[in-house]
Design a protein with these regions (language model features):
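An accessory alpha-helical subdomain
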Residues: 149-162, 166-238
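Conserved short beta-strand edge segments in small beta-sheet-based binding/regulatory domains
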Residues: 238-246
Length: 246
C-alpha cells in the first residue's frame, strides 16, 4: 500500500511547531508494511489543501491528512478535503450529539473556566463532514475526523492524532518486511557493499549516517521475509556490525 502524508499548518511552515506527526506516522505505517511515498506540509489554505488532497488521492492508495480540525477560523481542513474530493459536507447527527456531550462534560468538569471564558464552539460546523464519510471519534480530543475515498483526516494535536490513527491502523497492514543492523563503518566506505546487496537481492537498502558517537544504521526493506533475512546475512559478512544502541 502506497501512502502520502499531508500535514496542514502555518505553524509548521513557520518553524513554530515540529512536524512530529509525520515522523510518527511514517514509522507506524512502515512497521505495518505500508510504504510512505510522499510527505508534504501545506499552509492553512483551503484551495491549496484541496488541490493536494485531490492530487494525492489520485496517485496513492491512501492519504493521511493531519491538522486544521480545531474551532478557529483558520481550521479549514475538513472543508478543503470535501472540496478536493468533490463532496458536499453534510451534518452528521451522531457526531453533533457527541460534540454536545463533550462540551457539556467539559463545562461540568471545569465550572470556573466555563464561567470565566466564553467558549465559542460551533458544534454544527464541526459536525459537518464530507458526504459518504466514515466519522472517526475518540475521547482524546474534541474534533471529529473521518475517512472518505481513501483519505484519512486526523487532528493535528499529537496525542489526539495517535488515538484516532489507532482506530484505523489495521487498514494499513501490508506485505513490506524490514530489518535493521548497525555499523561503525562510515557510509563513504560502504559504497560497493551497498551496491552489491541491491544487485543480488530484491530489496531496498537505506543508509542513515549518525553522529560520531552513534553507529550508522542500515535498513533493508523488501516484500519477502526470507529475501530480507538473506540480504541482512550477506551484509553482516561484509561490514562490521555492533549491537543495537539502547
Amino acid at each position: 500500500m502506497d501512502v502520502a502524508l499531508l500535514t496542514v499548518g502555518d505553524e509548521v511552515l513557520a518553524g513554530d511547531t515540529m512536524n512530529t506527526n509525520a515522523s510518527w506516522l511514517a514509522a507506524e505505517l512502515t512497521d505495518r508494511g505500508a510504504t510512505v511515498r510522499r510527505i508534504l506540509t501545506v499552509p492553512d489554505d483551503r484551495v491549496v489543501i484541496a488541490e493536494w488532497t485531490r492530487e494525492f488521492a489520485d496517485e496513492y492508495d491512501a492519504v493521511i491528512v493531519t491538522g486544521g480540525l480545531g474551532g478557529t477560523p483558520d481550521d479549514v481542513t475538513m472543508a478543503a478535503v470535501a472540496d478536493g474530493l468533490g463532496y458536499e459536507r453534510v451534518l452528521f447527527e451522531d457526531v453533533r450529539e457527541g460534540l454536545r456531550a463533550k462540551s457539556a462534560a467539559f463545562r461540568e468538569a471545569n465550572p470556573e473556566l466555563a464561567e470565566r471564558y466564553e467558549f465559542d464552539l460551533d458544534i454544527e460546523e464541526a459536525a459537518r463532514l464530507p458526504e459518504d464519510a466514515r466519522p472517526l471519534v475518540t475521547d482524546a480530543g474534541w474534533a471529529a475526523g473521518c475517512v472518505v475515498d481513501g483519505v484519512y483526516v486526523l487532528p493535528g494535536v499529537p496525542d489526539e492524532m495517535k488515538a484516532m490513527f489507532h482506530l484505523v491502523a489495521d487498514e494499513f497492514d501490508g506485505d513490506v518486511v524490514s530489518e535493521t543492523l548497525y555499523t561503525p563503518t562510515p557510509e563513504g566506505a560502504m559504497g560497493d557493499v551497498l551496491s552489491g546487496v541491491r544487485e543480488r537481492f530484491d530489496v531496498q537498502v537505506g543508509s542513515y549516517p549518525a553522529d560520531p558517537e552513534t553507529p550508522n544504521r542500515l535498513k533493508v526493506t523488501g516484500t519477502d521475509e526470507r529475501t530480507v533475512a538473506d540480504a541482512i546475512a550477506w551484509l553482516r559478512e561484509r561490514v562490521e556490525t555492533v549491537p543495537t544502541p539502547e
